[in-house]
Amino acid sequence: MMLGTEGGEGFVVKVRGLPWSCSADEVQRFFSDCKIQNGAQGIRFIYTREGRPSGEAFVELESEDEVKLALKKDRETMGHRYVEVFKSNNVEMDWVLKHTGPNSPDTANDGFVRLRGLPFGCSKEEIVQFFSGLEIVPNGITLPVDFQGRSTGEAFVQFASQEIAEKALKKHKERIGHRYIEIFKSSRAEVRTHYDPPRKLMAMQRPGPYDRPGAGRGYNSIGRGAGFERMRRGAYGGGYGGYDDYNGYNDGYGFGSDRFGRDLNYCFSGMSDHRYGDGGSTFQSTTGHCVHMRGLPYRATENDIYNFFSPLNPVRVHIEIGPDGRVTGEADVEFATHEDAVAAMSKDKANMQHRYVELFLNSTAGASGGAYEHRYVELFLNSTAGASGGAYGSQMMGGMGLSNQSSYGGPASQQLSGGYGGGYGGQSSMSGYDQVLQENSSDFQSNIA
């Protein structure tokens, strides 16, 4: 039996999937058949720590019968979005509202703000000038980098007091150089999740003499299943993707880094088909510098995407179409340079219409021309910075011509041809190297045994 408000549980439902711009009036209209306690005041929206709508809300109703009516609205649409309705209670509602939003204990009173959209190569001195007149604590500026040592376009700044931090927030959308800077409330905990790169990677920058593909818990093993989703979160989605979850060594599912200490989130993010299965759509890049988008509104056009990245000028936009002929909510955006692609990542989690969009970097410094295909494959990733022709083709190992030979969970003979200029990775073009490749592969297998 459901207890009344005096018993502590109340008559509460939780709503998920609301449009980001949803108002209390719209929620009231959605539940027009139900009696909401205190009208609009009985609708409690949930916000992120940056103060943005999360797409969820609690609704307080007047009786158990009203709760039952509200639950019948589950999976009905608001605009063009399906809205989920769950049974909840006062205890859950109070806890969630206390621990989320910009004024939660995790974000209040520590003087931190997060900057997004910094120009490529922005220095701490430029940030100090940007906040001229506002006191920053000593060593209070943190500039996160990715696993390749590149700037993420973000920064964390700790001010001498929360009051000063509040003043800093008023500089939201002001410029550094030609870039608009977004400023959000932050916390020490958020800084730690973005800035503590795994120390073990430092010892993995160069391959050892006995490194070999596919050996046990080796760095090349690419698993399937839960690890893919963890990988897809990427370093820009809070934390460091697959590494934090699996300590970088995979254990057969998910992956953190390859033999050379590179984060595989960057190399494999941007794959198209999320059914963890067979292939998917293929996008051919002419520059090798792409950003993959996920979470687009289904009515988004190419022009919307060009405007989203303004003032950057993408070379080309490719909106993905699924096997059923419908848009997937994903797209690939090609840029002229690696620097432009990195700068575009500053728009990660920014809104397009009512949805926030996730971005995944698919660019390698120094890559020039050549096409790559992003598909789900069971091969380990072979990619070298500065490769010409096809940045995702083959990698020569020790001068022995061992390229695209070993696979994880698939036939050892599976090939991914098209490496250097489209003719140096496949079996048919290896000619005299075939025998060497086979002998080396056999040696590796015997070493493993």
Swiss-Prot record:
Region (2 X 16 AA Gly-rich approximate repeats): 234-433
Modification sites for Phosphotyrosine: Y246
Record's keyword terms, sorted: Acetylation, Disease variant, Intellectual disability, Isopeptide bond, Methylation, mRNA processing, mRNA splicing, Nucleus, Phosphoprotein, Repeat, Ribonucleoprotein, RNA-binding, Spliceosome, Ubl conjugation
GO biological process, one term: RNA processing
N-acetylmethionine PTM positions: M1, M2
In-chain residues carrying the UniProt-annotated modification Dimethylated arginine: R233
CDD domains the UniProt entry points to: RRM1_hnRNPH_hnRNPH2_hnRNPF, RRM2_hnRNPH_hnRNPH2_hnRNPF, RRM3_hnRNPH_hnRNPH2_hnRNPF
Listed Gene3D superfamilies: 3.30.70.330
GO cellular component terms listed in the entry, alphabetical order: catalytic step 2 spliceosome; cytosol; membrane; nucleoplasm; nucleus; ribonucleoprotein complex
Main location class: nucleus
Domain of life: Eukaryota
Function of the molecule: This protein is a component of the heterogeneous nuclear ribonucleoprotein (hnRNP) complexes which provide the substrate for the processing events that pre-mRNAs undergo before becoming functional, translatable mRNAs in the cytoplasm. Mediates pre-mRNA alternative splicing regulation. Inhibits, together with CUGBP1, insulin receptor (IR) pre-mRNA exon 11 inclusion in myoblast. Binds to the IR RNA. Binds poly(RG).
Domain notes from UniProt: Each quasi-RRM repeat bound poly(RG), while only the N-terminal QRRM bound poly(RC) and poly(RU). None of the repeats bound detectable amounts of poly(RA).
Illness the protein is tied to: Neurodevelopmental disorder with craniofacial dysmorphism and skeletal defects: An autosomal dominant disorder characterized by global developmental delay, severely impaired intellectual development with poor or absent speech, characteristic dysmorphic facial features, and variable skeletal abnormalities. Additional features include feeding difficulties, inability to walk or walking with an abnormal gait, and cerebellar or other abnormalities on brain imaging.
Record's subunit section: Part of a ternary complex containing FUBP2, PTBP1, PTBP2 and HNRNPH1. Identified in the spliceosome C complex. Interacts with IGF2BP1. Interacts with CUGBP1; the interaction is RNA-dependent. Interacts with MBNL1; the interaction in RNA-independent.
Name of the protein described by the UniProt record: Heterogeneous nuclear ribonucleoprotein H
Organism, as annotated: Homo sapiens
